[in-house]
Swiss-Prot record:
It is an enzyme of class 3 (hydrolase). HAMAP family: RNase_P. The keyword Flavoprotein does not apply. It comes from Bacillus velezensis (strain DSM 23117 / BGSC 10A6 / LMG 26770 / FZB42) (Bacillus amyloliquefaciens subsp. plantarum). This is Ribonuclease P protein component. The keyword Hydrolase applies. GO terms for biological process: tRNA 5'-leader removal. Keywords: Endonuclease, Hydrolase, Nuclease, RNA-binding, tRNA processing. RNaseP catalyzes the removal of the 5'-leader sequence from pre-tRNA to produce the mature 5'-terminus. It can also cleave other RNA substrates such as 4.5S RNA. The protein component plays an auxiliary but essential role in vivo by binding to the 5'-leader sequence and broadening the substrate specificity of the ribozyme. Belongs to the RnpA family. It catalyses: Endonucleolytic cleavage of RNA, removing 5'-extranucleotides from tRNA precursor. It holds the Pfam family Ribonuclease_P. Consists of a catalytic RNA component (M1 or rnpB) and a protein subunit.
Length: 116
Protein backbone atom coordinates (compact mmCIF):
# COMPACT_ATOMS: atom_id res chain seq x y z
CA UNK A 1 0.00 0.00 0.00
CA UNK A 2 1.30 3.44 -0.86
CA UNK A 3 2.18 5.97 1.84
CA UNK A 4 -0.65 8.30 0.89
CA UNK A 5 -3.10 5.43 1.54
CA UNK A 6 -1.94 4.87 5.13
CA UNK A 7 -3.05 6.34 8.43
CA UNK A 8 0.01 6.59 10.66
CA UNK A 9 -0.31 9.53 13.03
CA UNK A 10 -1.92 9.14 16.43
CA UNK A 11 -4.02 12.27 15.82
CA UNK A 12 -5.46 10.71 12.64
CA UNK A 13 -6.33 7.52 14.53
CA UNK A 14 -7.94 9.50 17.36
CA UNK A 15 -10.01 11.55 14.91
CA UNK A 16 -11.40 8.38 13.31
CA UNK A 17 -12.10 6.78 16.71
CA UNK A 18 -13.86 9.87 18.09
CA UNK A 19 -15.82 11.10 15.07
CA UNK A 20 -16.22 7.93 13.04
CA UNK A 21 -18.62 5.01 13.12
CA UNK A 22 -17.75 1.42 13.92
CA UNK A 23 -18.89 -1.99 12.76
CA UNK A 24 -17.58 -5.38 13.82
CA UNK A 25 -17.69 -9.07 13.10
CA UNK A 26 -15.87 -11.96 14.81
CA UNK A 27 -12.49 -11.27 13.23
CA UNK A 28 -12.29 -7.49 12.77
CA UNK A 29 -13.54 -4.13 13.99
CA UNK A 30 -13.84 -1.43 11.32
CA UNK A 31 -13.95 2.28 12.15
CA UNK A 32 -14.81 4.65 9.29
CA UNK A 33 -14.77 8.41 8.93
CA UNK A 34 -16.02 10.32 5.90
CA UNK A 35 -13.59 13.01 4.73
CA UNK A 36 -15.43 15.11 2.10
CA UNK A 37 -12.37 16.68 0.45
CA UNK A 38 -10.38 13.45 0.36
CA UNK A 39 -9.78 11.80 -3.01
CA UNK A 40 -8.25 8.50 -1.86
CA UNK A 41 -8.96 6.08 0.93
CA UNK A 42 -6.57 5.87 3.89
CA UNK A 43 -6.19 2.77 6.03
CA UNK A 44 -4.85 2.27 9.54
CA UNK A 45 -4.16 -1.17 11.00
CA UNK A 46 -4.04 -2.34 14.59
CA UNK A 47 -3.11 -5.87 15.57
CA UNK A 48 -2.96 -6.64 19.29
CA UNK A 49 -0.24 -8.69 20.97
CA UNK A 50 -3.03 -11.02 22.10
CA UNK A 51 -3.18 -12.38 18.55
CA UNK A 52 0.26 -13.98 18.70
CA UNK A 53 3.93 -13.35 18.32
CA UNK A 54 5.41 -10.83 15.88
CA UNK A 55 5.43 -13.32 13.01
CA UNK A 56 1.69 -13.98 13.35
CA UNK A 57 0.84 -10.28 13.80
CA UNK A 58 2.85 -9.27 10.74
CA UNK A 59 1.22 -12.04 8.69
CA UNK A 60 -2.23 -10.77 9.70
CA UNK A 61 -1.24 -7.21 8.70
CA UNK A 62 0.06 -8.41 5.32
CA UNK A 63 -3.17 -10.33 4.66
CA UNK A 64 -5.30 -7.30 5.57
CA UNK A 65 -3.20 -4.96 3.40
CA UNK A 66 -3.44 -7.32 0.42
CA UNK A 67 -7.21 -7.73 0.82
CA UNK A 68 -7.68 -3.94 0.99
CA UNK A 69 -5.36 -3.47 -1.99
CA UNK A 70 -7.50 -5.82 -4.09
CA UNK A 71 -10.72 -4.01 -3.08
CA UNK A 72 -9.25 -0.48 -3.22
CA UNK A 73 -10.80 0.57 -6.55
CA UNK A 74 -14.27 -0.44 -5.33
CA UNK A 75 -14.11 1.46 -2.02
CA UNK A 76 -15.18 5.03 -1.26
CA UNK A 77 -12.44 7.55 -0.38
CA UNK A 78 -12.74 7.50 3.41
CA UNK A 79 -10.44 7.04 6.38
CA UNK A 80 -10.80 3.70 8.04
CA UNK A 81 -9.09 1.69 10.74
CA UNK A 82 -9.13 -2.08 10.87
CA UNK A 83 -8.55 -3.69 14.25
CA UNK A 84 -7.84 -7.42 14.16
CA UNK A 85 -9.41 -9.61 16.83
CA UNK A 86 -7.95 -12.87 18.11
CA UNK A 87 -9.63 -15.21 15.55
CA UNK A 88 -7.96 -13.25 12.71
CA UNK A 89 -4.65 -14.95 13.51
CA UNK A 90 -5.94 -18.28 12.19
CA UNK A 91 -7.50 -17.06 8.93
CA UNK A 92 -6.30 -17.79 5.40
CA UNK A 93 -6.14 -14.99 2.84
CA UNK A 94 -9.50 -15.96 1.31
CA UNK A 95 -11.18 -15.97 4.73
CA UNK A 96 -9.60 -12.63 5.63
CA UNK A 97 -10.77 -11.06 2.38
CA UNK A 98 -14.29 -12.48 2.75
CA UNK A 99 -14.55 -11.20 6.33
CA UNK A 100 -13.38 -7.71 5.32
CA UNK A 101 -15.76 -7.65 2.33
CA UNK A 102 -18.59 -8.45 4.75
CA UNK A 103 -17.65 -5.43 6.90
CA UNK A 104 -17.25 -3.18 3.85
CA UNK A 105 -20.78 -4.12 2.73
CA UNK A 106 -22.24 -3.61 6.22
CA UNK A 107 -20.73 -0.12 6.44
CA UNK A 108 -21.62 0.81 2.83
CA UNK A 109 -17.99 1.42 1.92
CA UNK A 110 -18.40 0.16 -1.63
CA UNK A 111 -18.96 2.71 -4.38
CA UNK A 112 -22.42 2.70 -5.96
CA UNK A 113 -21.34 1.13 -9.26
CA UNK A 114 -19.93 -1.91 -7.43
CA UNK A 115 -21.78 -5.19 -7.86
CA UNK A 116 -20.72 -6.37 -4.37
Amino acid sequence: MKKRNRLKKNEDFQKVFKRGTSMANRQFVLYTLDQPKQEELRVGLSVSKKIGNAVVRNRVKRLIRQAVQEEKELLKPKDFIIIARKPAGDLSFEETKKSLQHLFRKTSLYKKSSSK
